[in-house]
Design a protein with these regions (language model features):
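Local sequence-structure signature of Cys/Sec-based thiol-disulfide redox active-site neighborhoods
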Residues: 31-37
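Post-cleavage N-terminal segment of exported redox proteins
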Residues: 1-25, 79, 109-127
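Short cysteine clusters
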Residues: 39-42
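Short helix/strand-bridging catalytic loops that position acidic/His residues to coordinate divalent metals
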Residues: 18-19, 57-59
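Extracytoplasmic electron-transfer domains, predominantly the class I c-type cytochrome c fold
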Residues: 24-25, 32, 46-50, 58-120
C-alpha cells in the first residue's frame, strides 16, 4: 500500500504540478531573498502570511508584467528603491539593500508565484 501511494503521489506531483513556470535558479534565489528579508512578516503570498501589506501572489498580474521578465524586474526595482515613500498616514515599507541579481531573482520568484494555479485562492484580486 505504501509503495502504491508513493507512486501515485509522485505521478500526481509530476503530472499535475501547479507551477506555470519552471523552478529556475533565479526563482530559488528570489525565494531565498524573500525568506532572508522576512517579506512574509508584512505581506501575504497566496493568502499566507501577515496582512499588514498587500498580497504579492498576484502582484505581477496587477502590474501587467507577468509575461515580461525585464518589465517585472524594472517595476519591482523602481518600487523597492522608492521605499519608504514618506506618504503621511500610509504604512511604510523599509528600504532593503538588495543586489541587482537578487532583485531579478525576487522578480522571477514573484512571477513564478503569480503563475501558480491556486484554484482562485485567495479570492481577492486586489493587493
Amino acid at each position: 500500500m505504501f509503495v502504491a501511494m508513493t507512486i501515485h503521489s509522485h505521478r500526481y506531483v509530476v503530472e499535475k504540478s501547479t507551477a506555470g513556470m519552471p523552478l529556475t535558479d533565479a526563482v530559488k534565489l528570489g525565494k531565498e531573498v524573500w525568506e532572508r528579508h522576512s517579506c512574509i512578516n508584512c505581506h501575504t503570498l497566496h493568502g499566507e502570511g501577515a496582512y499588514f501589506a498587500p498580497e504579492v501572489g498576484n502582484v505581477m498580474t496587477r502590474w501587467g508584467v507577468l509575461d515580461d521578465p525585464e518589465g517585472a524586474f524594472e517595476i519591482l526595482d523602481a518600487w523597492m528603491k522608492a521605499q519608504p515613500s514618506g506618504t503621511p498616514g500610509r504604512r511604510q515599507m523599509p528600504h532593503f539593500e538588495i543586489t541587482e541579481e537578487e532583485m531579478r531573482g525576487l522578480a522571477d520568484f514573484l512571477r513564478w508565484a503569480d503563475q501558480t494555479d491556486t484554484q482562485n485562492w485567495p479570492p481577492n484580486d486586489a493587493g
